[in-house]
Amino acid sequence: MSFAKIYTRGLLGLHAPLIEVEVHVSSGMPSLTIVGLPEAAVRESKDRVRSAILNSGFQFPTKRLTINLAPADLPKDGSRLDLPIALGILVASGQLPENCTDDLEFIGELALDGQLRPVTGILSIAIACQHDQHQLMLPGPNAQEACQLPDFKVFAANHLKEVCEHLAQTQCLAEIQTIPVDTNHFYKCDLADVKG
């Protein structure tokens, strides 16, 4: 397959709109082009993604890569798109199964060695993802924040290789369990007791 579509989320205030990362691998001079109104941190992800893919034991395609971040009119910022871009490249180049990312959304920054680094805005992203009835794959340090939502499937990984093994079903990640939230708090002091 020379085309892949991976789902992720952006951040727009408290909202987390859906972003489609479309990757097309074609013959031609080796290059990587990102279109769809990416800001500087997203454009810089080219080098992080290339190194992370190579250092995780995969091949970086020596072909022409075009990556579209849709919708094009929504600004994309931050490094949270590294993981979905890397997975799109691996699926489009045939290194991961074609439909392995169905019903999943991905978020996370990649280090040069393939480690996943935490990102901000996870609760907003998790709420939007749950609303669309998708599962979420994110960096391990972000798992506790995302698993506060009831009836929501969250998977956490610490390395790109772990994510790929899960998607290839060679070593599946355990679903992060929801943390029960105690809503019965008793406070000795009450603002109603304040006088003056």
Task: Report residues per predicted region.
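Peripheral, non-AAA+ core regions of ATP-driven protein-machinery
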Residues: 1-196
